[in-house]
């Protein structure tokens, strides 16, 4: 699974047996103090037990862009599945075995003439239950402010320069829907199987700030 | 005929999910999404009544005028129907 | 296109801003716990994601500039839980003092349940 930010990875994090990170050894912050105290109180009151918290962390850790990439790959190769994604992308995700909970997913497709990009200008809504956590930049001021007004300029900052005959469609996740971009299938991939195709699909291509990668 | 709508211009001071850059703008309903609990109530521990939610599509020229990079680029947002007024052609 | 009066700080679409900085960070354990707490407590019906957002918005722009995402989230979750009557501020304050007294680091203060004596 290729990564767009080379310094680190969210995927492959094992919730058990993971070595303590540096923050475990840093002085306790006020907010960490709150978090521990709140979690203990809620557990003692039976509102949110340690087991439930840990199970949720495990669930969160199991989600990553690789899941979305598999959905995109199947969309590319399987016309009947493609129609099911178009009809109900949440149901299609569950069909693939992904535990997406209550996620209401809409898949927007890139073509030769259309390029989609996703944002939440009001906060940071993101299809977490399918793709895992959003990148920091997605939640920050510059992206949220500018992509709805000058999407092409923002995309150029990501290295994506779109010609004038491609229509850009921006989707602002203002309410209950969440969005995934189905990037265009790269050329020269007719002989690749689903697994190899999924490896070309990056997180950023499913947000819409990049294309899927071309085969090596 | 796709329904043409205008987003209400009001600016109430509280938790609403209609971005200010869309208020007063004209778009077309891209699809109906069904009914969802009103976030304006849920945010304040009130029982949220179900309200009709629509995806509305705006052209970038409608939103930004001459500042639009490409007038035919579009912006889709989910807007609750109580924020939408009919805007016949 | 003049800006309508009454735009709230979090309502950022269309505002001027600098370049996108493609930064990202690995999540600390305490951050994952904050996130998980939000999911579990909201699933139990103690508050809604709408309430979470409302408190984040009401916190104001200065908080957005000075506190990290999960610092603001734990503040918002706490306020929502106080409003829901899940615990009292006195209970929280007392427990925070106890937690703080266990050591210096997050790891020392967040000892697993079996190791804790109160």
Regions found by a protein language model. Name each.
Chain A
Residues 2-216:
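Terminal, compositionally biased segments used for targeting/anchoring and flexible tails
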């Amino acid at each position: 699974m290729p990564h767009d930010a080379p310094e680190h990875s969210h995927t492959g994090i094992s919730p058990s047996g993971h070595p303590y990170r540096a923050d475990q050894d840093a002085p306790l912050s006020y907010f960490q103090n709150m978090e521990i105290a709140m979690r203990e109180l809620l557990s003692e009151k039976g509102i949110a037990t340690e087991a439930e918290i840990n199970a949720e962390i495990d669930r969160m850790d199991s989600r990553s862009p690789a899941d979305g990439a598999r959905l995109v790959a199947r969309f590319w190769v399987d016309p009947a599945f493609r129609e099911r994604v178009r009809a109900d992308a949440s149901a299609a995700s569950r069909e693939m075995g992904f535990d997406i909970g209550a996620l209401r997913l809409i898949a927007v497709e890139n073509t030769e003439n259309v390029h989609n990009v996703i944002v939440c200008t009001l906060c940071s809504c993101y299809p977490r239950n399918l793709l895992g956590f959003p990148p920091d930049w997605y939640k920050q001021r510059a992206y949220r402010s500018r992509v709805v007004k000058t999407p092409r300029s923002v995309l150029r900052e990501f290295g994506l320069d779109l010609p004038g005959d491609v229509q850009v469609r921006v989707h602002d996740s203002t309410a209950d829907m969440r969005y995934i971009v189905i990037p265009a299938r790269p050329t020269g991939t007719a002989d690749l199987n689903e697994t190899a195709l999924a490896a070309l699909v990056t997180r950023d291509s499913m947000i819409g700030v990049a294309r899927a990668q071309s085969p090596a | 005929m796709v329904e043409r709508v205008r987003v209400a211009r009001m600016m109430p001071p509280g938790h609403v999910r209609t971005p200010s850059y869309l208020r007063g703008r004209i778009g077309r309903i891209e699809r109906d999404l069904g009914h969802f609990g009103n976030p304006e109530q849920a945010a304040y521990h009130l029982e949220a009544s179900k309200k009709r939610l629509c995806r509305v599509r705006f052209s970038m020229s409608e939103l930004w005028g001459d500042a639009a990079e490409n007038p035919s680029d579009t912006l889709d947002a989910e807007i609750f129907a109580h924020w939408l007024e009919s805007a016949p052609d | 296109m003049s800006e309508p009066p009454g735009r709230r700080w979090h309502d950022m679409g269309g505002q001027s801003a600098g370049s996108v900085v493609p930064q990202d960070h690995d999540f600390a354990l305490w951050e994952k716990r904050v996130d998980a707490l939000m999911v579990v407590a909201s699933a139990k019906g103690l508050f809604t994601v709408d309430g979470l957002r409302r408190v984040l918005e009401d916190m104001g722009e200065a908080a957005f500039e000075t506190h990290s995402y999960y610092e603001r989230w734990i503040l918002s979750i706490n306020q929502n839980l106080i409003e829901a009557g899940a615990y009292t501020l006195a209970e929280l304050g007392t427990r925070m003092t106890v937690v703080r007294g266990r050591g210096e680091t997050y790891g020392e203060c967040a000892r697993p349940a079996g190791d804790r004596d109160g």
